[in-house]
Regions:
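Membrane-embedded alpha-helical bundles that constitute the cytochrome b-like, heme-associated redox core
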Residues: 1-235
Length: 235
């Protein structure tokens, strides 16, 4: 029995490279990732100082103060990186694949096929852009959580440091106290948002690896190289 191959029919497959994430987008991704990990660790220490320095009669060991200071610095780095990341999403030419992903949110068929692919009952649909609808929605919600944790964090900062930048922040964001019903609620919301990140990070890492294994077209390393691969037929 003779079968017709791709060579017989004159069809060949080519691997095409597409720039999916620009250099600055990738850089900001890793900046925010490292800041989030550090903020979670240092935040837990601020809430419950589980390490104590050696006892000293002189006020020269300020472990909690240093930890809080670096926590605040990392928080402002996260705020700056997040603002710049939003700017890149809307205006950077290299972020066009991300903006294109938005329109698939309106397609229920793509939604159904995407969920089916994660449940192993359907093939992953061909998507236009960087994200499928489930990914886009997840990252959008994560952006809202980032906004919440930054606003509550700035409010907590202003209630500790009353001069300089803290005074400016207090004048600009004192309304958060009233909206949340007091500083205790602001702190509670800040902690709840932290737990959202704690849950998200391992799930995100797992799904990135899962997608890379099941669909080896540059999933995991796309945030390193920025390149996504696709097969195209050439007659």
């Amino acid at each position: 029995m003779v079968t017709r191959t791709e060579i017989d029919t004159g069809i060949a497959k080519e691997i095409q490279q597409h720039l999916e994430f620009g250099a600055m987008t990738r850089f900001l991704h890793w900046v925010r990732a490292f800041m989030i990990v550090f903020l979670v660790a240092s935040g837990f220490y601020i809430a419950y100082p589980f390490l104590q320095p050696d006892a000293s009669g002189e006020p020269v060991i300020f472990l909690q103060a240093y930890n809080r200071a670096f926590h605040c610095i990392a928080g402002f780095v996260l705020i700056a990186a997040s603002i710049f990341r939003v700017y890149l999403f809307f205006f950077a030419p290299s972020s066009k694949p991300e903006r294109t992903s938005f329109w698939q949110l309106l397609n229920p068929l793509v939604w159904a096929k995407t969920i089916g692919a994660y449940l192993f009952i359907a093939k992953h649909p061909h998507i236009k852009g960087a994200y499928n609808p489930l990914q886009f929605t997840t990252y959008f919600v994560l952006g809202l959580v980032t906004l919440i944790i930054c606003l509550t964090g700035v409010n907590l900062y202003a209630n500790v440091y009353h001069d300089g930048l803290g005074g400016i922040m207090g004048a600009c964001f004192s309304w958060i106290d009233s909206v949340c019903g007091g500083l205790a609620n602001v702190r509670a919301i800040h902690h709840i948002a932290t737990w959202v990140f704690i849950v998200f990070v391992p799930v995100h890492i797992y799904l990135v690896i899962w997608n890379s294994v099941r669909y080896p077209n540059g999933g995991a390393d796309a945030m390193v190289s920025g390149i996504r691969y696709s097969e195209e037929q050439r007659v």
